[in-house]
Amino acid sequence: MPIFPKPKVTVILANLGTPDVPTASAVRAFLKQFLSDQRVIEIPKLLWKIILYSFVLPFRPKRVAHAYASVWGQDSPMREILFAQTDALKRQLISHYPQLDLNIVPAMTYGNPGVQHILKDLAASPQEHVILLPLFPQYSATSTAPLYDAFANWIPKQRHLPGLTIIKDYYRHPVFIQALVSSVQRFQQQHGKPQKLLMSFHGIPQPYADKGDPYADRCRETARLVAKQLGLTPDDWAISFQSRFGKQEWVKPYTDELLTTWAANGIKSVQILSPAFSADCLETLEELEIQNAELFLEAGGTSYQYIPALNTSVEHLELLRQLLQAHLDALNYSLAYSAH
């Protein structure tokens, strides 16, 4: 009777991306890749190319590099956290499936380790199954869909194709909501409660939402469920959207404008939670924690506190484990045990 090798299964844990180092040249390379994706910028290609190369890439990288440098440790926060999340899931999951040749790898849509390089490695070592877990709790064509595109471009070039599972999102998963609630409760036990809790999500252009991108609605549902579980009244909290880019209208309300309005209207203390980010990064550590704090305090507020992203919290790792284990259990049965 032939002895079959263990079925190879790879889990790809994917986040958006980051420059290699906080320098203008590295940021330029990153922005060039990121902003050249038509999922991100839906402007006619030739027109956008002129804008990108004439007005964005010559000037923006230096300013953005300075912002990255202000939050950079030994590496980019996003990459450090992604690697730590991956290592933790390896410890939790690989020994649980001895019948599978299971690997868990980190990937970035833009920058390194790039998802294209991960897929190239998989082609060199054909897999029975690949599970892609984008670390975007709320699906958007601007964030999650480019990972679908990477697979769509890779598949026609392969002869030995794996089974493929993509976990689209988890914006209302009860373990996700509880993880956010626990992070707020833990923070407030130490720092007290503010007048307002603001749940700030990365924004998208309003025309994208008008064309059917479900992201903003999913953000609102995440925020509603968190507020409900915290027992907040409508006066206790609000939702907003940050990080707008360019001159077109984005989904509203805008985080910076809401904060200054609150301060002008006598709101003195605010805490910020950003449930769109699975790892702290430039948009949370620099934009939310530094820039928006300055805006609020200069407008008359007296207390502004940022509640960290879920990062490698026990509750977050439990969420990721559960998201993956449901699929791994099925694969373990269908791939490993059917071979015996």
Swiss-Prot record:
GO terms for biological process: heme biosynthetic process. The keyword Nucleotide-binding does not apply. It catalyses: heme b + 2 H(+) = protoporphyrin IX + Fe(2+). It is found in: Cytoplasm. Its main location: cytoplasm. The keyword Lyase applies. It is an enzyme of class 4 (lyase). Keywords: Cytoplasm, Heme biosynthesis, Iron, Lyase, Metal-binding, Porphyrin biosynthesis. PROSITE patterns: FERROCHELATASE. Its EC number is 4.98.1.1. Fe cation binds at residues 202, 283. Disulfide bonds: none annotated. InterPro entries: Ferrochelatase, Ferrochelatase_AS, Ferrochelatase_C, Ferrochelatase_N. NCBIfam families: hemH. Catalyzes the ferrous insertion into protoporphyrin IX. This is Ferrochelatase. The lineage of its organism: Bacteria, Pseudomonadati, Pseudomonadota, Gammaproteobacteria, Moraxellales.
